[in-house]
Swiss-Prot record:
Stated family: Belongs to the nanovirus U1 protein family.
Name of the protein described by the UniProt record: Protein U1
Amino acid sequence: MSVNDYSLFDEATDELVSSERKLIAVDCHDDDSQVINVKVEDIFCDMSDKVVLKLQFRLCYKYRKLLDITLLGCRMKVYTELKTPSERSLKSILQKKMNIISDGNYLIGIRMFFININQLINTCKWITRIEDVYPICTLYHVNNTPVIDI
């Protein structure tokens, strides 16, 4: 199971985000703030009584600003072996694991964002599969626009 950034498009321009741009990263290990925010959007049971989660991951504002990214996130549907999870406990568990992963990597950028999500998914043995993965990225373009003198 993996989430990839191979065909990640800039939502503002519909252009493919370049490999070079994906590799740009900033330090994130000296900070106590959350690097990637995890949100449990929904919990439900499928037809075979498997608990399904709708998860959302977002790069926090501080690092988006440092990387000149307006939005970097990912939504997905996650199938689990869990029986009766609560939204609050799942968010807490997933956020703690994500914080440990992010702190251990020292850097964050577009590529590392997706690597961290994959690492989180692979460390949660109760996750059986993922579907409907929707990565989203909008790069900051204000600095790239020419100034017009009137």
